[in-house]
Amino acid sequence: MAQPSILFSLTLIFLISIKSCDAKYRTSFFKTPNCSIYPDAEKCELNKTWTQEQVCDYVNCNDNACEGGGYLLWTQYVECASSTFSRVILIIVGVIYMLVLFIMVSSAADDFFSPSISSIVAHLRISESVAGVTFMAFGNGAPDVFGSIASVLSSPTPKADLALGELFGGGLFVTTMVVSTIILTSPFDVEVFSTIRDLLFYLVALSFLAFCFVFYNRVTLWMPLTFLGLYLLYVITVIGAQAVHNRKRKALQKQNSTKSRKSIKSLRSRKSIHSVAPMPVIPEIEVHDQEAPFPEISVVTGAIDKLKEHMAEKAQTTRRYTKRASFMVNGDGNLNGLHPYATHNHLGISRRESELSDEDEEFVVIHGHVFQGHEARSRAASLVPEPMQIKSWRSKDILKDLAEHLDPRPEAEDWEEMNIFSKVMAYINVVPNLLFKLTIPLNEMSWSKPLTLLHAFTCPAFLLFSIQFFLETPFSGSPGLWVYGLAVSIVLAILIMVFTELSVQPKYYKEIYSYSGFIMSIAWIYLISSEVVNVVTMLGVVSRVSHEVLGLTILAWSNSIGDLIADVSVVKQGYPRMAMAAAIGGPLFNLLMGFGLPFTIAKLQGKYISMTINPTYRLLILFLAISLLATLIGIPVQKFRLQRPHAAVLISIYIAFIVFVILSETGVLVWN
């Protein structure tokens, strides 16, 4: 177990040394540039007449504009290379590095981020739609929002169009390509109110920004404050709608219980009058309501119990459960629905009534599988091994326990089901998975006190490292923030040592690991996204593609890869409505907070923020509005079920946008 720790430590030291020794690096490996002839640039714009040495000096002097904010300075590496061969090799290595990062962010989203989201949603007992526009939106949008904050606060004279360009570009990509991917993966019935609500809020925010660009040439304080207020109104609307939904659900439950009692009384009455032979005992399902308890509900036939037994047997071999295959209860133990045949044919509950409760069905994700319905938690928990019985710290079981929890290889059962491509990806992902397990608490694993102690030190350190605050000093004469992080780690370690036992799982272990795993997953996604942006920025500088086109295309794609991976992962788990809510609510969150928060801070700092709109951004706002209107109109046209033809429409809109941008950049399309 020493080797993984050494590998992780060396990786951290290497990356930190690269970042902290940035200034020394320029003087050691390259000729010290004369930055006085290269004033601070807001965009990385290279003159075609410059020599390679001048280009190298320029990118060294303007690393804030020519780099993406990650640790590895790819633009400097390539532009300051000693030969063309070295440049080509560095570009190839950079592309390979970016592909590995894509694999890493996919693993982080699928294996760590999604399970944490699922557990948090189950713990808070919130619906798919609320989860999509809060936790998933924050998780997906963290790189974009933090990127917007960094770009605005790092410049003495920030420009609104540059900061919003990537937010708009990412929003268009998500509302067209990501939404279409969700639909192609699994056509689904739309959660009408929440989806239309999100689309309308998005259109209002977009219209307000267009108004500001047309009638103002600078940002004033009331503009970002309006966006923050709009987001607050949005959150209130979401919570209010959920409260109304819960009241309707409880009223429906009482109505259904009354119908059930009447049906049972009628059935027993007919039995006592007309029965000739003894009737078989009718299996019963007892349901309790906290506010209004009602008598037991008997199902007319034994089909439900047989189906439940069959699904339980199937679960022992496949660990998969059909979404509506069993009797379902929500977190409070209330009746949500029965098997469709029993529900519709025997209890007289309409399809619309049964769908009313679908949104609140309890679900738990364990080891990549969704468990939903009655006893979802107990079924899921059955897959989580019990804590290893470790008698003392001197036991060899300590190392064995750590080895099992940190094992980066896929489980034997999953390995047998993989195809060749998946196995290759699994091999590539061995080292990233080890790093993830060292720094991301995973609530699917059994309790391990040694691992928890290790996380107490690795998580605070990596959190500071991921946001590049590891060596920052909060005030003059203060040590780096890593010292304060170490102090926090020591306190956590003492608490763990005193208040937990080796072989007994603490009471709130799952909840704490879910929330901390959520935060650390976001930290990894943010770090990986920054590194991807660095490589993409290098490709743009090398190819001399304009900043606008780069931001609206390649940067938008790379920044949105987390949205695509996370949303598709949720769809495959059987929750397309949550993914749809995140696909619309995520970019909406990014726009409202990505404009509202950083520009409010910048205006409070007294900065002047210009607002100009060029032809490329006009196209972007236009096509983003078209994509939102297409979905808004397409929902009722398709009878509230998004199907594959709608995905084709969204893809066509995005392709048309790319074509118009190319025509505008090449001068074929001229704006008056």
UniProtKB/Swiss-Prot annotation:
Presence of keyword Translocase: no
Cellular component, GO, one term: membrane
Signal peptide limits: 1-23
Main location: membrane
Pfam families found in the cross-reference section: Na_Ca_ex
Membrane topology, record value: Multi-pass membrane protein
GO BP field: intracellular calcium ion homeostasis; monoatomic cation transport
GO-annotated molecular function: calcium:sodium antiporter activity
Family assignment from sequence similarity: Belongs to the Ca(2+):cation antiporter (CaCA) (TC 2.A.19) family.
Stated name of the protein: Putative sodium/calcium exchanger 7
